[in-house]
Amino acid sequence: MSLRIGIDIGSTTVKVVLLDEQNKLLFRSYERHYSKTRERACETLHSIQEMLQGKQVKLVITGSAGLGVANASGIDFVQEVYATAAAVNTYIPDTDAVIELGGEDAKIIFFGGALEERMNGSCAGGTGAFIDQMATLMNVTVNELDELSLKHEKIYPIASRCGVFAKSDIQPILNQGGRKEDVAASIFQAVVDQTVAGLTQGRELKGKIVFLGGPLHFLMGLRQRFVETLKLDEAHAIFPEDGDCFAAMGAALCA
C-alpha cells in the first residue's frame, strides 16, 4: 500500500495531509509555524510515523514559503495554483471558480478552459494578516471579531487596501460610538470588496464558487459577507470540510 503526503507551507501556517491510494484523507494538520517552517513540518511528520511504517510513501511540498524548504530537503515542489487545481478537480470537479484567502495573499482561480489565476500584489490588505491587524486594533481576538460580526445591524465603508487606511476609517467610527458588531462586519465586508473588485478585474464571478483557505474555513462572518455580496445560494457557495488544507491535499495528489 502506498501513501502520499502533501505539505503546504504558507506565510503563517503549515498544513500536512496524508492520502491513501483512493485519495481518502487519513490525516490532516493545520498549525501556525511562527517562522519555524521546517521544525513544524518535521514535528507533524514525526507524529504520524507509525501510520507510515511498512508503507511506500511519496511526499510533495507546495505553498508560498515551501520552495526553499523543498530545495533544501531535496523534495519535489509543485506551484500552489496547480496543487489547488488538482484538489478541486479531484474532489469538486464541476467548480467554476475558487476564492482562496491566506495569511498574506488572496487569489481567485477561474476554471473552465484554460486555468486562470488572479492574485493580490505585495500588500497584505484583504488577507488573514489584515484581519489579524484589525482584531488587534479593536482589542479582540479574531474569533471574537467573527462572533461580533454575526450580530451586526449595518455596514460601514472601510478601506481594506491598507491597514493604515483602514485604521483611519475605523477609529472615528468607534470614537463616535459605533457598535463593535457593525465595525467587525464592516471589516469582513472590506475584505470581500478588496478580493472581488481587486482580483476579478471586471470578470464575472458566476456558477459554483469554492471558498478555500484558513480565514474562509474558520470565520463564519467572513463567509456570510462573501455569500451575500455575490448573491450565492447553497448550491453555488461551496465551503469544503477541509478547505483550509486543500492545497496540501492537491500536493499529495501530485505525488
Question: Where on the chain are the PLM-derived regions?
Answer:
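Glycine-rich phosphate-binding/hydrolytic loop that grips phosphoryl groups
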Residues: I131-D132, I238-A255
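Adenine-nucleotide phosphate-binding core of ATP-dependent small-molecule kinases
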Residues: A166-Q201, D244
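Glycine-rich phosphate-binding loop plus the immediately following alpha-helix
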Residues: K36, G113-K154, C162, L253
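Short glycine-rich, Thr/Ser-proximal phosphate-binding strand/loop in the N-terminal lobe
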Residues: R4-E39, E43-H46, L115-E117, G121
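Short glycine-aspartate micro-motif
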Residues: S2-D8, K58-V60, D94-E100
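Glycine-rich phosphate-binding loops at beta-strand->alpha-helix junctions
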Residues: A65, R203-T229, P240-D244
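Phosphate/pyrophosphate-binding loops at sites that engage ATP/ADP/AMP, CoA/4′-phosphopantetheine
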Residues: L45-V57, T195-G207
